[in-house]
Structure formats: C-alpha cells, structure tokens
C-alpha cells in the first residue's frame, strides 16, 4: 500500500537565499534526528509507534535522495559518535533507501525499507542499560538483547499505515543468510528481500562508527569485511553490490593515496566505477599545499594505490584501529 507522504513536515527548516543546498540538507538531517528522538522516547514510554513522526523522516529522506543523492549519501555514512541508537536509525533508513533507489525498488518497497530501518532499533530503549556496551555478553543477557528488533515489529502489527513489508524489515534486519543472525536465526529465503538490503546498510554503518567495546573502522575496511562475509554466504550478494554502487569501494570519508603521490579524502561514489570515486586531493609538494577535486573516472591515469587510517576520536585516544570487526556485531544497531 503506497502512502502519500506529506510534502511539508515538522522538519522544514527555513532557508535564506545565501544558504547552500548542502547546508540546508544538513540542517534538515539534524532535524530528522530530533524527530526520531521524539519517536523513540514516545515508544519507550508507551510501546506504540507514532507513524506520523516516522513518515516525516522517511518523506524527507526521499526528497533529499531525489534532490542530491551524493550529499544525502554523505550524510548517511558519517561516522556516529553520539546519539545512539537514534542517529544510527536515521542514517540506516537513509542509506537503505539510497540502496533501494539504486536497486529500482517500487515506491511501496522504498517506504517499507525506509520505515522499517528507521524504527527497528526503537526497542533498544527497552533493553536494560546494563547490557549495552558489554562485550562479551553473557548468554542469558544476550537473549534479552537480541529481542530488541521484535519490539518495534510487534508494534507495527495491524498498523494499516505501514506497507506490509515494513514489519519484516524491522524484525529481520539482524538476520543473516547463513543462519548466524538474530532474533530467530532465519536462513536464506526465510529472510525478506528488503531485510537483506537493510542488513547490509545497518552493518556497514555499525562498522564505521565506534561502539563501547571497540573503535570505529576505516570505511574501506568495512566494505572489505562485508564483501568477505558475502562470499561466505552471510549477506545477499545483490545487496552488497548495491552498497558498492552507492558508497563505492572507497566509501565517503575514506583516506586514500594516489599513484602520483597525492593523498585525498573521498567525497562521492561513481556508480559505474566503484573503484574510481570523486575525491579531494592534497598536493603537499605544492607551496602552499594545493587542494583539487578529482574525479578518478575522468582521469584514467590516476588510481588509488593505498588506503589510509580513519582520523577519528578512537585513533586520537591511541586505540588500535585493527580491532577485529564482526559483521554480526551485537551492537551494530
């Protein structure tokens, strides 16, 4: 069932003539985090989902993706240092919808994956706080933790305003094709197609953000781990391929070195050339140092030869970014 989502919302932010589109989108994205915080707080107290609030966020995501896909994806993949699980949920919804657009999902499917990804972690607010940030976690406590996606899924039961697949996305986003996921250990075709895509988005975002028991990881390394996991049968290969189309082999924010000696930071992906993103390159040999935007797809003589470390809060504090990554992390979100 397609829902005619509102064109105006609680998230509208007045824009001055000199404000850039990107700056406005960033402000509206922050507004979406605030609305989602209200949604989660209300769910924690009443165990009911206010879909009016949720649709505001999903509608804004759809508008941002249509308006400027690159900026929208950039907002979706910013490493998360605070406001978990609210901001993670907003980002997961946005990235899942970006992947859905690339995969040519129907309007119903886009709404379902956007809404299901947005609310799936609302149940984390019902999990005892003593269980969060603990690794390893005791088995009896793990049983409580892994039930969190079911809380939102149960709240969606019988809600005619939500597309039918929404509940599947919320309930199954942490399931894995090889049966290693939770809460039910579903395998293969038992996992809804949309949930498979949402799972890849959720996992990628979880990896590039720090968790209480580990630092953040370089986006490129997260992509590598997801590709490896897909090869082992944990993730849907079509969903992983779509992630690559959207964020590239070198995701937004990755530090890279080019074969001409310059270092750079990835700005945007090139859908048809996942190993040749658009980046901002820094020439340290130029006096003063020179910055240049470079589209590797239009510069065949240039290529990435090395990927660097992510300069995040974890690395500043001296933590080792080589901490093992789990693609089935309890705290991925």
Positions of predicted regions on the chain:
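A composition-driven signal for long, intrinsically disordered, charge-rich low-complexity tracts
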Residues: 4-7, 196
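Generic hydrophobic, helix-prone segments enriched in Leu/Val/Ile
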Residues: 1, 22-29, 304-307
């Amino acid at each position: 069932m397609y829902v005619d989502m509102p064109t105006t919302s609680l998230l509208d932010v007045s824009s001055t003539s000199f404000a850039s589109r990107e700056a406005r989108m960033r402000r509206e994205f922050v507004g979406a985090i605030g609305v989602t915080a209200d949604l989660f707080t209300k769910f924690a107290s009443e165990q009911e989902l206010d879909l009016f609030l949720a649709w505001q966020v999903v509608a804004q995501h759809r508008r941002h993706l249509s308006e400027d896909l690159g900026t929208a994806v950039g907002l979706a993949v910013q490493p998360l240092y605070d406001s978990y699980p609210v901001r993670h949920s907003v980002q997961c919804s946005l990235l899942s919808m970006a992947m859905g657009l690339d995969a040519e999902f129907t309007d119903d499917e886009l709404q379902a994956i956007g809404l299901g990804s947005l609310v799936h972690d609302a149940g984390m607010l019902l999990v005892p706080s003593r269980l969060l940030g603990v690794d390893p976690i005791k088995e009896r406590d793990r049983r409580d933790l892994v039930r969190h996606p079911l809380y939102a899924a149960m709240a969606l039961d019988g809600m005619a305003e939500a597309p039918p697949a929404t509940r599947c996305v919320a309930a199954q986003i942490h399931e894995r094709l090889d049966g290693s996921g939770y809460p039910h250990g579903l395998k293969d075709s038992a996992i809804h197609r949309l949930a498979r895509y949402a799972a890849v988005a959720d996992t990628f975002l979880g990896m590039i953000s720090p968790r209480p028991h580990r630092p953040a990881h370089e986006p490129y390394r997260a992509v590598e781990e997801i590709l490896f996991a897909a090869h082992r049968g944990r993730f849907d290969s079509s969903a992983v391929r779509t992630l690559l189309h959207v964020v590239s082999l070198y995701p937004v924010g990755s530090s890279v070195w080019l074969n001409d000696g310059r270092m750079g930071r990835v700005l945007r992906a090139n859908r048809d050339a996942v190993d040749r993103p658009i980046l901002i390159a820094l020439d340290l040999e130029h006096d003063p140092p020179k910055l240049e935007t470079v589209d590797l797809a239009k510069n065949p003589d240039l290529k990435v030869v090395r990927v660097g470390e992510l300069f995040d809060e974890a690395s500043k504090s001296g933590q080792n970014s080589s901490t093992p990554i789990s693609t089935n992390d309890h705290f991925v979100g």
